[in-house]
Amino acid sequence: MVRGKIEMKKIENATSRQVTFSKRRNGLLKKAYELSVLCDAQLSLIIFSQRGRLYEFSSSDMQKTIERYRKYTKDHETSNHDSQIHLQQLKQEASHMITKIELLEFHKRKLLGQGIASCSLEELQEIDSQLQRSLGKVRERKAQLFKEQLEKLKAKEKQLLEENVKLHQKNVINPWRGSSTDQQQEKYKVIDLNLEVETDLFIGLPNRNC
């Protein structure tokens, strides 16, 4: 016979409610014991009946388990609190950063001449002063770059002049010094002339007087 599904609501009959409590309590205590043994779990179970009677089970010392639970929840709450504070700080920093960006964009548009129709004379004078300061910095940087480039060109010119002087000095010391290839070619020409002379001397038969 199939057991009917029990509706999950308070049992109105006191006797039936007490019988159900006893059965479910014993089953719950048994399951808690099995869980602690099979899974080596630290487990504590506290039950108060409707009349205020205490039923409890603990795989170890009940007080130690409660202290461990309190410490865990306290640390967890502290960690959550710190996280909330850090998150709030990040939100404030992001809000300040957005405000700064908007202010910079506003000043940028003013410096570009956008939206200045509503500016007062003092505001326009301040914008003009900022532009003059910016223009002065640009010119100063431009002059510095020109100076650095000129110094590099002068250094390059000095290097080329020194190399030219060294080459001139070498030519003065050895004005007739040629390359090794030219010297070898001249040597071979002399040898060839000598060979031609010697060949001319031995060609032909000696003259005999008849």
From Swiss-Prot:
One of its GO terms (biological process) is leaf senescence. It comes from Arabidopsis thaliana (Mouse-ear cress). Plants over-expressing AGL42 have a significant delay of leaf and flower senescence and a deficiency in flower abscission. One of its GO terms (molecular function) is DNA-binding transcription factor activity. Keywords: Developmental protein, Differentiation, DNA-binding, Flowering, Nucleus, Transcription, Transcription regulation. Expressed in quiescent center (QC) cells of root tips. Expressed at the base of the petiole of cotyledons and leaves, in flower buds, petals, sepals and abscission zone of flowers and siliques. Residues 1-61 form the MADS-box domain. GO terms for cellular component: nucleus. Disruption phenotype: No visible phenotype under normal growth conditions. The keyword Transcription applies. This is MADS-box protein AGL42. Gene3D superfamilies: Transcription factor, MADS-box (3.40.1810.10).
